């Protein structure tokens, strides 16, 4: 008898059944390890995880699922709609039936139709390259240890820096953290009620950072996975205090935080430049404009004057625009001028937003202006 197959949004799917299914596919037992524990922000009942998913069922039984979660990102004065892909799951006995492919294409079509600006995920480059995703979100990663600290901080006065874990959603420190978070030049929207759950994603811990003399100094998510300071000049004091407790550390710094990149580069043992995620862009002109503006704000007087016209054969349609810098001020505008560079979709993602782009190396302006500081903090990943 032919099976009844459904492919579409997960409306009407039982949440407990859904969680059991994705936990099973990922090898979680659902108790000690599972999606509800890893990402309560997404899988609590009030978050409606099934409605944010695409599923395949055979005779009513789940065989495949992917989650698509919408977030708002503030980039300088621009707001972008960023859709994250998560829990891509296919039952072991339902593989090779094209279910993942069908759901991914369905999700991408809906993201484009709904006005998403870009999408991010974690996963293998070639696996998700079939669906237009490419390595992006370049960061500098630094390793710092006690030996570095002993040499670099020996003449620095000691300070009473403390890390206090925050576990109560009503902790008054959270209000300070939210306000500080929203002062950053690049941040994902985190409402007050969900802030703790968001920061504790992936079983990380949230810490308030305090100075014995001055009080609230910032907050840390995980083991330096995210560090937000009220005063960036406190970076060395915070690193020193962290190393005293932990011995060594790794810290990833997005490209917009130039002061921290500079400070970390002076005391680190090793540094690495790499991509932190996979992205696909649906509105290249808009997203390039937002992040080029952010770069000009955080690295003033560093953009050389020039103009470059690009034609992108994007998954959401062709886009042709001119990127120009005049007296250090960037603009990105639609144009019908003949393009200087023609790019396929994934080439364009790497060209503007990736750590490595062979096409970018062929153009002096592109090599000088890009990559742009696109980034999503780990706590905001899905």
Please state what every model-predicted region is.
Residues 79-92, 221-233:
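Conserved acetyl-CoA binding element of GNAT-fold acetyltransferases
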Residues 116-117, 123-142, 258-275:
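Conserved active-site alpha-helix within GNAT-family acetyltransferase domains
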Residues 56, 68, 90, 209, ...:
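GNAT/GCN5-related N-acetyltransferase fold signature
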Residues 94-106, 116, 234-241:
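Conserved acetyl-CoA pyrophosphate-binding loop and the N-cap/start of the following alpha-helix
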Residues 1-70, 77-80, 84, 150-192, ...:
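Short amphipathic alpha-helix that is part of the acyltransferase structural core
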Residues 104, 108-123, 246-257:
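Conserved GNAT acetyl-CoA-binding A-motif
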Residues 334-382:
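C-terminal interaction segments
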Residues 139-250, 255-260, 286-306:
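Amide-forming acyltransferase catalytic core, primarily the GNAT-like/NAT-type
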